C-alpha cells in the first residue's frame, strides 16, 4: 500500500491479521479518483435509465455525477487508507491511568447490504499507557471507518483495533448505538428500533468494575 502514513499501514495490517478488514478485492489496475468517478457516473446513468428516469430533466441530469463524487470523496472515502486521519500522540508524562471517554460521537455510515444509511452515535474509552491521543483524532478515526459500506459489528471492532494498535494498549472500549435505514425505511419498516454493539479489550473485558464504569458512561449514568 504505497504512500500511506505509518499509522495507516499499521492499522490496516492489524485489521487484516485479525480478519476484520472490510472485504475488498485486489484492484484490477490503478485508477485515479477522477476516473473512478467517471466510471461510476456512467453506471449510475444506466441504473437511472433502467428505472425510466428522464436524465434530460434539469433536476436529474447531474445526479449520476453527484452520486459518483459523493461515493468517492465522501461516504466511501474510508475505503482509501490515503484518507486515514493524521494521528497526534503525546507522551503520557502526566501518568494518566484512569479511563478517558469520548461520548456521543456523531456517526453516519452506509449499510453494505442495501447501501442505505446507518445513523447513530459512538462512545469510545481507553486507559492510557505510554501515550495519549488528541481527542479529536478519536472522532476522526470513528468517521474514517464509518465512511465505508459497513456492518455495525465489524465497524465497532475496527475502531477498537485501530485504537489498540495506535495507543499500544488493549485497554480500549467502543460502543455504537445506531438506527439502520434498511430496517427503518424498507422491509419490516420499524421506525423506532436501534442496534447497540459493544467491543471491549483488556481491562474493559477482564475487570467488572472497569466494564461497568464504561457502560455507565455509555448510558450517561453518574
UniProtKB/Swiss-Prot annotation:
Keywords: Allosteric enzyme, GTP-binding, Hydrolase, Metal-binding, Nucleotide-binding, One-carbon metabolism, Zinc
InterPro entries: GTP-CH-I_C/QueF, GTP-CH-I_N, GTP_CycHdrlase_I, GTP_CycHdrlase_I_CS, GTP_CycHdrlase_I_dom
One GO CC term, this protein: cytoplasm
Any one GO biological process: tetrahydrofolate biosynthetic process
CDD domains, alphabetized: GTP_cyclohydro1
Pathway in which this enzyme or protein is active: Cofactor biosynthesis; 7,8-dihydroneopterin triphosphate biosynthesis; 7,8-dihydroneopterin triphosphate from GTP: step 1/1
Protein name: GTP cyclohydrolase 1
Originating species: Salmonella typhimurium (strain LT2 / SGSC1412 / ATCC 700720)
